[in-house]
Amino acid sequence: MRSAESVNKNIVTICIEPEESIETISSIADLVFCADWAKVAADVVAAAKEQGAEHFVLFSINRHITNNPMYSALNASFKAECEAQGLNYVYDNSVDPIYSSGIKGAQLYIKESIARLFNNEKINGNNIALFSTDSSVQSTLVELARDRGLIYVCPSFPTAYNGLGEVFDKEQVG
């Protein structure tokens, strides 16, 4: 963005739903749009409960939870909403896909984590809602929901297609 601004001083930079630190993004962007994540948490947990969830598993990464106050607040909102709705809340700090293990490593971690949670009796049955702040693992959550009969409530970003096309081998148009 700084390179573009050096060529055109009138360029306006807008960031929508930053995954990085607000401090970092706001030093680059002229305008930042973010969802009301407390409302998102309330809506997602309510939808999970409506679909029969008794457990809610949130996967996130350190870069989101520690570097981005919005995601940190999201974690707290999910926990509070789960308590209010009577759902067992489980947080799992997962592998960041930008590091050495990459996206495949992050996806593998999610699969192994679900197995560990079952083995350690942190969750049971198929009344388990899955959510992650990491867009690179959405297809893994969809696969787990499909293959194990779990609940995939929605992706982390406001799109109905994140992860679905990959799993169901559908071309996304538009």
Annotate the PLM regions.
Residues 4-38:
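Flexible loop/hinge segments that line or gate small-molecule binding clefts
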